[in-house]
Amino acid sequence: MKSKLFSFGFLLVGLSLFLLTSTFLFSCKKESVSTPKKIDYNLIGAEHNKGLDYVFNYVKENTAKDKSKFKTKADFLSLVEKGTQEFLENSDLLVNEKNIAIAIDESKKPFTFYSSCINSGIKSTTLEKLWPDEVDNLLTDKQKEILSEMNDILNNNTDIQAIIEGLNKLEDKINSECSTEEKDVLLSATSIAKYSFQYWHDNFDTWMNEFGKEYNLTSGRKFSWSEVGKNDVAYGVGGGVAGAIVGGSVSLGILTLPGWAAGAIGGAVGGSIGNAILQIW
């Protein structure tokens, strides 16, 4: 009898331990799933630069086939836009049709603006603020404050290292003073700005040597890093806000980010390369 009671008691203890362990493991698993993952915003800036390289090679390949098709600024801008769209369609980060559509839609907005500048004879293609008018009511006062400070950094510095250092300090302020929702747009903007300035600092001569002599891409004035960077950031911010409204997700390595990343990448690539082409033409 004692043997049976002992066996039954042992069974109860074992069952209790099993349930306790299972509950603990389930709780840990549940906690790990709900724990937010850290976002590497640098991936957005890096993808932006990949887009610029892609478009450079796209334009180089297509102009080599028949240079006579690209006699005007509008012709060249149209080719650049097609290259931008092809990049977004093949981007490793945009993993589904919805994300690709968000990115392409946002990339079209700066090209529409640049085309209107060409048609109306407007020389300046720089937006006044670091965000398009259509998202003004969707940004918080804090976001506008930070973006205005970023505007000052881009306007008041001609040295690329000074600009990057200024943006790094601004990122510290964003992390300490802004909400999680505000940070996404702002930190993607600083990432885009840093990567864009570095790219054109390193590659502007490459673009000019490839296309400048053949197409006489020169405006007779010094290339403005600030102008490119400001358009980059502005359309990246606009694209990010619009992408967040539309929704969708972007896979960045082990991360899955909301649709603002797709919009930010699309808007920034179009804003950067379109403005740069109009400057050097």
Q: Predicted segments — roles?
A:
Residues 11-12, 99-101, 187, 191, ...:
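N-terminal cationic amphipathic segment used for targeting or macromolecule association
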